[in-house]
Amino acid sequence: MMLKPSIDTLLDKVPSKYSLVILQAKRAHELESGATPTQAFTSVKPTLQALEEIEAGNVVIHPDPEAKRAAVRARAEAERIAKEEEERKIKEQIAKEKEEEGEKI
């Protein structure tokens, strides 16, 4: 039985079998958690979908793990700031509405 994608094709995309397994496991976990797929799949299982993405070159190992961690932290910080700003605007709107209610009475 021939596996698709073949191990040889996949090993052309990553430096080692170990790296391939780690990349596949992480991407399969992301897909299972609801990450946006990078392509249409022929497979149903997330593990095989991850291999399809690796074969297509849509998923790669980040060359600098520290830079990736810094980018993830920066994105999380930006999301936190955006959320705080949204909450501040909501509070201002509520205060404004309460002030207008006080003037009407």
From Swiss-Prot:
Gene Ontology, cellular component aspect: DNA-directed RNA polymerase complex
EC number: 2.7.7.6
GO molecular function, one term: DNA binding
Single Gene Ontology BP annotation: DNA-templated transcription
SUPFAM superfamilies, per the entry: RPB6/omega subunit-like
Catalytic reaction(s) noted: RNA(n) + a ribonucleoside 5'-triphosphate = RNA(n+1) + diphosphate
Pfam families per UniProt: RNA_pol_Rpb6
Keywords: DNA-directed RNA polymerase, Nucleotidyltransferase, Transcription, Transferase
Keyword Transferase among record annotations: yes
PANTHER family: DNA-DIRECTED RNA POLYMERASE SUBUNIT OMEGA
Function: Promotes RNA polymerase assembly. Latches the N- and C-terminal regions of the beta' subunit thereby facilitating its interaction with the beta and alpha subunits.
Cross-referenced HAMAP family: RNApol_bact_RpoZ (MF_00366)
Subunit organization: The RNAP catalytic core consists of 2 alpha, 1 beta, 1 beta' and 1 omega subunit. When a sigma factor is associated with the core the holoenzyme is formed, which can initiate transcription.
Family membership: Belongs to the RNA polymerase subunit omega family.
Protein name, per record: DNA-directed RNA polymerase subunit omega
Lineage of the organism: Bacteria, Bacillati, Bacillota, Bacilli, Lactobacillales
Gene (UniProt): rpoZ
